[in-house]
Each structure stands twice: as C-alpha cells, then as structure tokens.
C-alpha cells in the first residue's frame, strides 16, 4: 500500500520539477519579447521588454513644442502605460497556462 503512495509522490515531484523548468524557460522567453505602446496617434512610442523594462522611447519631432512640455510629458506617460499594459497581457497569456485554476491574486499571471 505504501509503495503505491510513494510512486505517486515521486511522479508528482517529477511533474512539479518539469513544470518549474517549463515556467523558467517561459519566463526567460518572455524577457526576450518586446511590446510597443503608443500615444498621440503614434507621435510617442515606448518599447518595453517582457520583463517590464523600458528599452526605448521614440518621440516624433513635430510633437516637441517648447511652449507645451506638459503635453509631451502626458504623451510619454500614456505610451509607457500602454506598453506596460501590453506586457501584462503578454505575461498573462504566456505564464497563465501554468497557473490555470490556482486562483492567484490579480496580476500574478
């Protein structure tokens, strides 16, 4: 009776180790992906990695108005938030397959 229980436990441990390995690989692949957030009809673009690092900010020359720096700041902020939202969506779709049915708090895949 105990032997069967130990065999099941070993199988469960192997499955957990495989899942951890698969999750680590998916997390690594996520970091290699990029998303693009935009604002102002593409006047400001922010590129971020799958690990939520802003990699690049592009600002079209025609949006730069020394008399209205606040508008430019708002566009950069909006583009950054758009990029980070897309990273969350990418993360949820990539990592969510590992956490289905676990009832983790929001934002945790």
Curated annotation (Swiss-Prot):
Would the keyword DNA-binding be found if you checked this record's keyword annotation?
yes
Q: What are the subcellular locations of this protein?
A: Cytoplasm, Nucleoid
Ordered alphabetically, the record's keywords are: Cytoplasm, DNA-binding
- Read off the SUPFAM superfamilies from this record: YbaB-like
Its signal peptide is: none
Q: Which family does it belong to?
A: Belongs to the YbaB/EbfC family.
Report the protein name in the record: Nucleoid-associated protein BcerKBAB4_0019
In its UniProt entry, the species of origin is given as Bacillus mycoides (strain KBAB4) (Bacillus weihenstephanensis)
């Amino acid at each position: 009776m105990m032997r069967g229980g130990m065999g099941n436990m070993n199988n469960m441990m192997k499955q957990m180790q495989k899942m951890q390995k698969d999750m680590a690989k998916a997390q690594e692949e996520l970091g290699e992906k990029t998303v693009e957030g935009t604002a102002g009809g593409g006047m400001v673009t922010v590129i971020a990695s799958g690990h939520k690092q802003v990699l690049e900010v592009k600002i079209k020359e025609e949006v730069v108005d020394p008399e209205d720096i606040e508008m430019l700041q708002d566009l950069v902020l909006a583009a950054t938030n758009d990029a980070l939202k897309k990273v969350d969506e990418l993360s949820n779709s990539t990592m969510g397959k590992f956490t289905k049915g676990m009832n983790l708090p929001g934002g945790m895949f």
